[in-house]
Amino acid sequence: MAPISLSWLLRLATFCHLTVLLAGQHHGVTKCNITCSKMTSKIPVALLIHYQQNQASCGKRAIILETRQHRLFCADPKEQWVKDAMQHLDRQAAALTRNGGTFEKQIGEVKPRTTPAAGGMDESVVLEPEATGESSSLEPTPSSQEAQRALGTSPELPTGVTGSSGTRLPPTPKAQDGGPVGTELFRVPPVSTAATWQSSAPHQPGPSLWAEAKTSEAPSTQDPSTQASTASSPAPEENAPSEGQRVWGQGQSPRPENSLEREEMGPVPAHTDAFQDWGPGSMAHVSVVPVSSEGTPSREPVASGSWTPKAEEPIHATMDPQRLGVLITPVPDAQAATRRQAVGLLAFLGLLFCLGVAMFTYQSLQGCPRKMAGEMAEGLRYIPRSCGSNSYVLVPV
């Protein structure tokens, strides 16, 4: 019984070693990084930023939730609050992927803006010439009267005749209703008339709005009798423009107040040829283009048939840095897994070699020499039970 038990022990040891090697290789290939022993309770959706499902090799299915502090919790995928949280996170990820970020439009408060003289946006009103040839006096037309009523100024047009210098005066800041506004005077050769009207601030409901105009005089080589000065008068309360309206002149490109880029306007790109034949005996009127209350200019044709350019509002992109956290799971190294498999295979082969050597040695030790095979006595052979044993077995010959 002793030799049989020893061989079975060797076989059992070989089987156990082989089982351990195979189990180690199996665990080396699996990718179960998080083992969920218990499920968490309900977590507010506002604290979650990411979720993922655990690996199939983990056995028990669970949802791994990540909070803003990058803490991981196991949740049961069958619960309703877990399903709602997964849908909420999926919608957030879809919106972030579609837009590439959260785009927000900057809308400033309704208050007068201060336009610096050097960096602000220049606003000017360009008068369109209309040659009459009959009278050299400046008479208000119906469109100019409507502009006067909208601006709250006197019937006299605040115009100034400039010389043919072809230069451009710097904008003059004026204070009105809480802040200065930049105005600009253009000179167009040979002789042009430019108005220095104030761009009115956003109208607010309440008491009547007073408009203030300042006389602008430019150097001129013409007769002083052709120069007209501006005058200011209080606007009647019933003629005050409604809330959100603004009067723009022809050739002016209205820009939203929240624009961060400074764009300078060129000297009248559309009606340059109309000023060539405009003499001192001509008459000018103002083209009025209504603007909607939301701040975007309406594309309506002006008196000369041209279209006002459409302003483009800047879009500022902001991204939430907390939403950009990506849970990176460690990927097992392929070379390390191959190395572990090679080491396990070599160990298994070595164990088999050692087992073979041990069994050969055991069998060699169990064999007895021929001289101890027994002696013949009266037709019987004495065979010892084992090598070195004093007990014999009688075997008939």
UniProtKB/Swiss-Prot annotation:
Residues 1-24 form the signal peptide. Residues 128-265, 289-309 are annotated as: Disordered. SMART domains: SCY (SM00199). Residues 25-100 are annotated as: Chemokine and involved in interaction with ITGAV:ITGB3 and ITGA4:ITGB1. Changing R71A: Loss of binding to CX3CR1 and ability to induce chemotaxis but no effect on binding to integrins. Residues 133-147, 193-202 have a biased composition (Polar residues). This is Fractalkine. It is a single-pass type I membrane protein. It comes from the Eukaryota. Glycans are attached at N33, T183, S253, T329. Residues 101-341 are annotated as: Mucin-like stalk. Residues 25-341 are extracellular. It is found in: Cell membrane.
